[in-house]
From Swiss-Prot:
UniProt xrefs under InterPro entries: bL21-like, bL21-like_sf, Ribosomal_bL21
Protein keywords: Ribonucleoprotein, Ribosomal protein, RNA-binding, rRNA-binding
Example of a GO biological process term: translation
Residue ranges with Low complexity bias: 115-124
Family: Belongs to the bacterial ribosomal protein bL21 family.
Quaternary structure and interacting proteins, as annotated: Part of the 50S ribosomal subunit. Contacts protein L20.
Recorded name of the encoding gene: rplU
Upper taxonomic lineage: Bacteria, Pseudomonadati, Pseudomonadota, Alphaproteobacteria, Hyphomicrobiales
Physiological role: This protein binds to 23S rRNA in the presence of protein L20.
Protein name: Large ribosomal subunit protein bL21
UniProt source species: Xanthobacter autotrophicus (strain ATCC BAA-1158 / Py2)
SUPFAM superfamilies associated with the record: L21p-like (SSF141091)
GO MF entry, a single one: structural constituent of ribosome
């Protein structure tokens, strides 16, 4: 099952356990958000007008970060005129934990802890 959600004026196609990078949300790491659902897909499809009634997508904020630097450079030739400006967008990484609607619910499996690294043989 997948869903199309709206976050900060943009649309994202998500499934359970996906991690998406969206524009900055004012939220602390670990907080939970519910996003409006524009469309649900799977065995049956539901398209909202504008939202699908009773459908929810829940996500947990994983990280607050910044994007790559974008350089804006303007030059007017033969005028000795140039301008250089950099920009880095504030971004939020969100992990989709649950999609529910159309009578079914899909939950993301909790991230399993990484198995400990095999230790070197102590007898060697």
């Amino acid at each position: 099952m997948f869903a199309v959600i709206k976050a900060n004026g943009k649309q994202y196609r998500v499934a359970a356990a996906d991690e998406i990078t969206i524009d900055h949300l004012d939220a602390e790491v670990g907080s939970v958000f519910t996003f409006p659902v524009l469309m649900l897909g799977g065995a049956t499809v539901a398209i909202g007008a504008p939202h699908v009634d009773g459908a929810t997508v829940t996500g947990e904020v994983v990280e607050q970060t910044r994007g790559d630097k974008v350089i804006a450079f303007k030059k007017r030739r033969r005028q000795n005129s140039r301008r250089k400006r950099g920009f880095r967008a504030d971004l939020t990484v969100v992990r989709i934990t649950e999609i529910s609607g159309l009578g079914e619910t899909v939950k993301a499996e909790p991230k399993s802890k990484r198995a400990p690294a095999p230790e070197a043989a102590a007898d060697a």
